[in-house]
Amino acid sequence: MTNAELRSFIPNVIHEVDGEELLIDKLRPWLESAAAWLTGNFIGEGYAPAPTLEALAKKIIVCKAFAEAVPSLDLTLSPAGFAVISTEGRAPASKERIERLVASLHSSVDANLPPMILLLLHNAEWRSTSIGQYWLGTFMFGLDDAQLHKRDKDLLTTYRSMRDMALRFQTELEHKYLGRRLMIQLMAAGYDPEATPDEQNLWQMIRHAELRYITFHSSDRKAQCPDLHEIWHLVAPVIREIGYSPAIREVWESEMGDKLRVEPFKNTVQGGFFF
């Protein structure tokens, strides 16, 4: 990234005078930290993003780095302790203005993460990576569902909290109702262009059930999680829908058919009412 590129992501920054350190050099430690954060949580090591994705990634890195750096940019360490750099006739920004700037930069990070994740999720090569498998670990739609969820924290923290509840829901869903094979088959259907309409429909149904579960348990932290009675009511329509797709039903019955098959009652006691 060049200094000019960096400046294009941060409006209203005064240009350096001759001999002054470039802005990109001032931000270097924070840029490296932000890049490591983005790589570790989203892109993964060794993956070369396409140009569209790379532009989003650069914007996120710059905004996150600048938000982290802002409180320190006008401070210098002197022999007598920390001092504020002279503004040379410019009025120093108030604490409130700086806080609004930092909040705006963090908002920009959160606004650009969802489209970046969707670009990644629609890339088969990235989906096969370990970080890709992490983001395919639930039926939530990338970061979009976390973005719409009521929250008071940053987007990634909100997503992780929702993901924990989603995994509890999915554990019961897999072990008691769907089985491992069908779960794996359906979880990628939201992003796989080769998924059948039936697979995409079931993925969407499970996604909505999962979000209802998360919404309830987010608002009532004392509620039992997982609540098996609640899960059954959420998953019952999914089980019924499976019956309409012969191909999916075959996969499901091969693993779960015997577990969910209800044997008719038979009286084994000999007597006048024996049948």
Predicted segments with their positions:
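Conserved short "hinge" loops at termini or chain/domain junctions
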Residues: 1-58, 72-275
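Catalytic-loop motifs flanking and including active-site residues across diverse enzymes
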Residues: 61
